[in-house]
Amino acid sequence: MSEDHKKQLEQQLWNIANTLRGKMNADEFRDYILGFIFYKYLAEKMEIYANKILKEGGDTFLFSEIDENTATGQEYIEAIKEESLEKLGYFLKPSELFSAVSKRGNHNEDSTESDRVAEDTTETYNTKDNFILEDLQKILNNIQNSTMGTDSEEDFEDLFEDMDLNSTKLGKSPEARNEIIAKVLAHLDKIDFKLENTELDVLGDAYEYLIGKFASGAGKKAGEFYTPQEVSTVLAKLVTTGKKKLKSVYDPTCGSGSLLLRVAKEVEEVNNFYGQELNRTTYNLARMNMILHGVHYRTFDIKQEDTLEHPQHLEHRFEAIVANPPFSANWSANQLFMSDDRFSQYGKLAPGSKADFAFVQHMVHHLAENGQMAVVLPHGALFRGSAEGHIRKYLIEEKNFLDAVIGLPANIFYGTSIPTCILVFKKCRENPNDILFIDASADFEKVKTQNMLSDANVAKIVSTYRERKTEDKYSYVAPLSEVAENDYNLNIPRYVDTFEEEEQIDIENVATQIEDLAADLKENEKLIASFCKELNIKTPF
């Protein structure tokens, strides 16, 4: 697929999203448009798989042509359902396919003028035949119900709960709501997501594009579900350094799941994806995102809970861990955690008002011996004292897990302008006697009000990390002894000197210039005085 075609698809989807924009704010209509796209994806995958089964069985008709009201049709449906639940994790009947519902919702729009006269109606939408709200709600419920008692039940549970089709935000009356939904379905139905071409991830890329667009319009709320793509790329490349395959990848604050999926793009294969997310709506988005990117329901395990207070994967150790936790979030810091294996060995807990190092401790606990992890933190985590200073010292002096500190530009995250950094940890370090410091804070491109890392900026960070090189005013490999001398303060300017000397001023030359200007001024004053005398007017000086 050409880049132009890809951009055209993305613009088409964003235009459809804007059909709902006037009715509600960005994060609300996000849930609807992404939900409808997801429903279309499920339906088309179902149809492709069912048609394949029919073809392999020697049948010449399509899944959508099966008559559900006949005994023979029911036999076909039951047989396909059994295989679909195993392969796809869910099932849709022919009448529940996206294209079928869209056609019903836009029945009169597609009919001829004579058809409309015969039906004795002058409305384009909202006749009895094309009222689809109730049917659509039942179908979304049926998708979930089809998984009950199967291995995929948890992955589909309440997946569409944020799509309230009876919300007055969609329209004041059922007829108005039906009209807007029918329009959205009709527009989506015209778009070819090319799902039959398994080499292309057209829809996955478009979904990520939309998530990013919604994040840019969501302000502070964006941080709940989205890490800018270029930052995700840096994190993903850091934790996959030297790896072609991963047994597992984990994100303890996974948001929409985009960061996990970005890691998968950097290697040939990821066996299993794990994540945890506090926000219920974002948790639903993460599961949709996984399924829509073709991650099989048996290979991802996303949980909804508070990661620090109620961790859901304590028995697991992961080969790669990435995270962009909420900056300096509050947590309970309950003293009972001093007997929790994640925190007990450090002797101190992160303060209740700043959970940054609590997330780091949690991640280190889950890191496999051959694993790598990268986490985004606010700059304060590099130098704040008290308990945080103690934990920082323990991680470096006792554990020697810290591999690199990377300073990022300010204002690259939606909703906050604070400068951030990436800490990279490894349990088995190839360079156990030093820590790499990179100052990439000045390397960015300005896009409207936001700063962004360009492809070149990303490549420079990653290559500097992988080559572990010192570059004037950009990076420095600091011996552990130097870090100890700085009392384990990791503030980057202590290690990377970015000071630019001002050009020396030639005082004698400046004095000569002033004298010359003064002489010129006197000559000009004489000239003006002579003009004033000729004009018989008073001189201005």
Predicted regions, residues:
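Non-catalytic, mostly N-terminal accessory regions of nucleic-acid modification and defense proteins
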Residues: 1-234, 238-239, 298-307, 407-411, ...
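Alpha-helix initiation/capping motif
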Residues: 2, 174-177, 195-199, 224, ...
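A conserved structural/catalytic subdomain of Rossmann-like adenosyl-cofactor enzymes
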Residues: 4, 70, 311, 315-541
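Conserved, well-folded catalytic cores of nucleic-acid-processing
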Residues: 19, 187, 191, 209, ...
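Short small-residue beta-strand/loop micro-motif enriched in glycine and branched aliphatics
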Residues: 215-218, 269-272, 445-446
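Conserved S-adenosyl-L-methionine
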Residues: 221-323, 328-346, 357-358, 378-380, ...
